[in-house]
Amino acid sequence: MANALGFRDLGLIDYETAWHAMQRFTDGRGREAGDEVWLVQHPPVFTQGQSGKAEHLLLPGNIPVVQVDRGGQVTYHGPGQLVAYLMLDVRRLGFGVRDLVTRIENTLIALLADYGVTAAAKADAPGVYVDGAKIASLGLRIRNGCSFHGLALNVDMDLEPFRRINPCGYAGLAMTQLSDQAGQIEFSEVSVRLRAQLVKHLDYAEQATLTGGINQYD
């Protein structure tokens, strides 16, 4: 079992600021560096993964599109969506990529179960689904044995922008969110519960709250 998993709660932050900081954190970390999770929300943005195809961007309109270095195709981020960026030394943890994905999916399934929502993963389409509608997306990059990017859970947000794309490359894929499934919820409580489930499913001994922002990685 690993030691503490550190969490930074960064609030609403520009996507590209977070992305470039993730890259610098990953490229600069030593073998003894602690693992971190950054909890954020983003202003509206579409992100296109490495295997993304232009035809899946239907009508982006005034929402910016950012080409990024994670796996997968196009997705949407916006306020009311809880994003967790996982900067983990997966080589030290002993996880393969498929194992890591499964652990993240199980984290989300357990979190949703806390709210009485039954969710499941799909073998051929990473993410978490409720009655066939996608409630959480995953996208990772592994570099030098360390992960970055992570997960996005739809909590209480405007889902309309998902209709401007084929989410994750699937035409007509229905999207849902926790507030539609469980009623009124506190965003901050979801974040706290996600922290606990990540520590459990990623086999850490405990969690730690990290202070300070990510300006150190500018």
From Swiss-Prot:
Functional pathway: Protein modification; protein lipoylation via endogenous pathway; protein N(6)-(lipoyl)lysine from octanoyl-[acyl-carrier-protein]: step 1/2
GO cellular component, one term: cytoplasm
Signal peptide stretch: none
Keyword check for Aminoacyl-tRNA synthetase: no
UniProt key word Chaperone: no
E.C. no: 2.3.1.181
GO MF annotation list: lipoyl(octanoyl) transferase activity
Binding site for substrate: 70-77, 137-139, 150-152
Chain positions of site Lowers pKa of active site Cys: 134
Catalytic activity: octanoyl-[ACP] + L-lysyl-[protein] = N(6)-octanoyl-L-lysyl-[protein] + holo-[ACP] + H(+)
Subcellular location: Cytoplasm
Positions of the catalytic residues: 168
Gene3D superfamilies from the UniProt entry: Bira Bifunctional Protein, Domain 2 (3.30.930.10)
Domain BPL/LPL catalytic: 31-206
Keywords, ordered alphabetically: Acyltransferase, Cytoplasm, Transferase
GO process annotations (BP): protein modification process
Xref: SUPFAM superfamilies: Class II aaRS and biotin synthetases (SSF55681)
Task performed by this protein: Catalyzes the transfer of endogenously produced octanoic acid from octanoyl-acyl-carrier-protein onto the lipoyl domains of lipoate-dependent enzymes. Lipoyl-ACP can also act as a substrate although octanoyl-ACP is likely to be the physiological substrate.
Protein family according to the UniProt entry: Belongs to the LipB family.
Note, other: In the reaction, the free carboxyl group of octanoic acid is attached via an amide linkage to the epsilon-amino group of a specific lysine residue of lipoyl domains of lipoate-dependent enzymes.
Name of protein: Octanoyltransferase
